[in-house]
């Protein structure tokens, strides 16, 4: 879900200024409003999806009586019910939204001058998806790089701004 929020908001905000060029020409309005509105719209979708996820998690843990907690959950490889870290979720969402807003402002302004930004964005987002620990744990990347004697690349890997955010979401849920 965090990745869909990120990629959806960044991709949609590309055309937010160009799509509203009539409004920009007729009324004085800061152009930053359009990417911000797109990001906030995606944030609403993200909140709705998170509500569904929470009900799904609660449904699994309550109705099917799956044991929860670190001692039982480790046998399954994950925790069913989130711990105290769930209290950090609003701060994590705020941090992710600020990152998305910054990238969206940059992309939407670049797209005004260079129309190929949208094509490049698709390629970059596809590559970025695989460079972020979404479908694999971050420890897997570290272990693979250490095996090959390239442990210094792991620190470069951690410079990906979505990597710590994804790790934090995994820790919470």
Please describe what each predicted stretch is.
Residues 16-30, 54-57, 69-73, 122-146:
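Hydrophobic alpha-helical transmembrane segments
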Residues 2-13, 97-109, 130-139:
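Transmembrane alpha-helical segments that form the membrane-embedded catalytic/substrate-channel core
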Residues 2-7, 84-92, 152-155:
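Short alpha-helical transmembrane interface motifs in multi-pass membrane proteins
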Residues 16, 20-26, 109, 113, ...:
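Residue-level recognition of specific faces of alpha-helices
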Residues 5-31, 35-43:
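Transmembrane helix boundary and interhelical loop/hinge segments in multi-pass membrane proteins
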Residues 31, 38-124, 128:
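Alpha-helical transmembrane segments and their short interhelical loops
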Residues 130-173:
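Short hydrophobic, aromatic-rich alpha-helical segments embedded in or entering the lipid bilayer
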């Amino acid at each position: 879900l965090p990745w869909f929020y990120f990629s959806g908001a960044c991709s949609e905000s590309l055309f937010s200024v160009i799509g509203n060029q009539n409004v920009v020409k007729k009324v004085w309005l800061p152009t930053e409003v359009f990417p911000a509105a797109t990001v906030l719209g995606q944030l609403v979708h993200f909140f709705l999806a998170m509500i569904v996820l929470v009900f799904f998690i609660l449904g699994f843990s309550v109705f099917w009586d799956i044991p929860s907690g670190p001692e039982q959950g480790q046998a399954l490889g994950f925790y069913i019910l989130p711990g105290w870290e769930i209290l950090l979720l609003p701060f994590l969402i705020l941090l992710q939204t600020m990152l998305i807003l910054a990238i969206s402002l940059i992309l939407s302004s670049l797209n005004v001058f260079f129309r190929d930004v949208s094509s490049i964005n698709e390629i970059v987002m596809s590559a970025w998806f695989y460079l972020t620990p979404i479908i694999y744990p971050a420890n897997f990347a570290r272990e693979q790089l250490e095996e090959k004697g390239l442990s210094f690349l792991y620190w470069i890997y951690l410079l990906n701004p979505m990597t710590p955010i994804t790790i934090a979401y995994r820790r919470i849920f």
